[in-house]
Amino acid sequence: MSDISPQLAKEAPKGGFAGADYNAVATSAELEGINLLSIEFSINPDCLLYEAQWKLSFGRKVLSCHYNEEDHSVAAIFQYHVTAKYGRKRALHCVADYGVFYQTHNGATEEAAIGFCRNVGTFAAYPYFRALVARLTNDAGVRLPPLPIIASTAHIPPKTPKKAKK
């Protein structure tokens, strides 16, 4: 289950742009492409016998994001990684960079276009990374569970601290 909401923003998101600008980009942007840009994959053969004891960690980050006002386009590079460790040894490691490209409407603000691409692009490319890891680990004869889904928390209000009991 995902906590991603299809609701339009009711207030200005963080990043210095108005909710209306962001919503205009979100409702008009068209995905132009998702491309694998680079990959690094390695397995430590000494750890293969201990596969059931591997501890997995995952991560993602935005490497860059650029808006081209002339072409009305925005592009970002997202990096995803998964690492399996057996004790202190790295048993498996996969890092992949994906480029995500959107066409925006004429008049989109740079801040809104970049905010949209950073927010939405990470979810657009992640299924490709999950499939890549599944294919590579299968080809290597490794049985990993499916990578977890990622979910947006942008629309979830922050928790208020509880008062200490006296």
Predicted regions and their residues:
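N-terminal intrinsically disordered, cationic/polar leader segments
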Residues: 1-120, 131-166
